A protein has these predicted regions:
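Beta-lactamase-like hydrolase cores
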Residues: 46, 51-80
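Active-site SXXK
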Residues: 85, 102-128, 156, 207-211, ...
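Active-site helix/loop module of the DD-peptidase/beta-lactamase fold
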Residues: 103, 122-161, 186, 215-250, ...
């Protein structure tokens, strides 16, 4: 048996490979820390705001972070942090309305990966070894390499489809293409699928189309039913393809507070207020190193549409990342979720990651 998770149709039973068992063990330890210091708080109808000192966060450190933003990252629109289930830091800049959704760009990929996890839990997808060729056979163009029909859900999730992709040039080609799915599935194969990581927004869109097909609903309707409404997320606009399908790789709009909810779902091992949205084993595998990643995520590793890293202090962490500096950054050991959001489209010379600000917030947290 390969060291990948195998979800069985019609059953909650999950078979684990070595990496998944290790991930669950590590997550159990950090979850125990969180449970030891706070009861579960569920922000479905709104976040609780608390004094940072009540949750072991140094307010002087947070004030120092807030003061750096206007001069150092003037494009930043919002910076928020949740610890122990309550907001302990929340700042908006440049006139940003807290209730106005922001285009989270490639953070959309982490939403799509989550929807794949829900579909697996519901038995709508047979398992991670199921292929796009089995689910959407009629979407393959006649020029597609036969290898592409055999690309599995695991490979789409981990960006190891082996399809050639240039992060900027092919994104522009995708936007101009009359059929995003056909354009992606018709790309050249440059390696054996499953062997090499290549960042591919088109692949995330294909993943979303397979989830929609399996659910029998448009992806946005499925997302609203199984993810957005249960978490109390009110999305804004969602970019659409020429086929009138929402873009599963980029272009969803969310408020910064709703972005926090997605990170909090994973921090709580896929559970939300007594309901298991995704299986704990899927949440663990999604946020565990599966493939090597590349410079797109600062050479972090890659899970299931999440980037895998560690803080400067060495705490395991994972994050969703969007063009321009959109972040949902989760540090389980600290029971911490940080969101950074940028509302306007940036010129290339303005691009500057707020990662060091996130690190400063993490450094302000006193370990439990």
């Amino acid at each position: 048996m390969s060291e990948k998770i195998s979800f069985m149709r019609g059953s909650r039973r999950v078979l684990l490979g070595g990496f998944a068992a290790a991930a669950l063990g590590a997550r159990a330890g950090t979850r125990a820390v969180a449970q030891a210091v706070t009861p579960d708080l569920w922000p479905t109808h709104g976040w609780t705001v608390a004094d940072p000192t009540e949750h072991g966060v140094d307010p002087i450190g947070l004030d120092a972070v807030a003061a750096r933003v206007p001069d150092e990252v003037p494009a930043l629109s919002a910076l928020l942090a949740v610890r122990h289930g309550s907001i302990v830091f929340e700042r908006y800049y440049g006139g940003q309305d807290p209730d106005a959704p922001i285009n989270v760009r490639s953070v959309t990929k982490s939403v799509t990966g989550t929807l794949a996890g829900v579909a697996l839990r519901q038995g709508l997808l047979a398992g991670l070894e199921q292929t796009a060729g089995e689910i959407i056979p009629d979407r393959f163009p006649e020029w597609a390499d036969p290898l592409v029909t055999g690309v599995t859900l695991w490979q789409w999730l981990t960006m190891t489809s082996a399809l050639q992709w240039d992060a900027y040039g092919d994104w522009q080609r995708l936007l101009a293409a009359p059929d995003w799915v056909a354009m992606t599935l018709g790309l050249p194969v440059v390696d054996i699928p499953g062997q090499t990581y290549v960042y591919n927004t088109g692949g995330s869109h294909v993943l979303g189309v397979t989830v929609a097909e399996a659910s029998g609903k448009p992806l946005e309707d499925y997302a609203d039913e199984v993810l957005f409404r249960p978490l109390g997320i009110t999305p804004g606009n969602w970019m659409r393809s020429p086929q009138d399908e929402v873009s599963a790789g980029s272009g969803l709009e969310m408020t910064p507070r709703d972005m926090l909810k997605l990170g909090y779902l994973y921090l709580r091992d896929g559970e939300w207020d007594g309901e298991q949205i995704i299986e704990p084993v899927f949440a663990a595998a999604a946020t565990t190193w599966q493939s090597a990643g590349d410079s797109t995520g600062g050479w972090a590793g890659y899970g299931f549409q999440w980037w895998i890293t560690a803080t400067d202090a060495g705490y395991p962490a994972y994050f969703a990342l969007g063009y321009g500096g959109q972040h949902i950054f989760v540090v389980p050991t600290l029971d911490l979720v940080v969101v950074a959001a940028i509302a306007r489209r940036l010129d290339p010379q303005e691009l500057r990651t707020p990662r060091y600000l996130i690190e400063a917030i993490a450094a302000s947290c006193i370990p439990d």
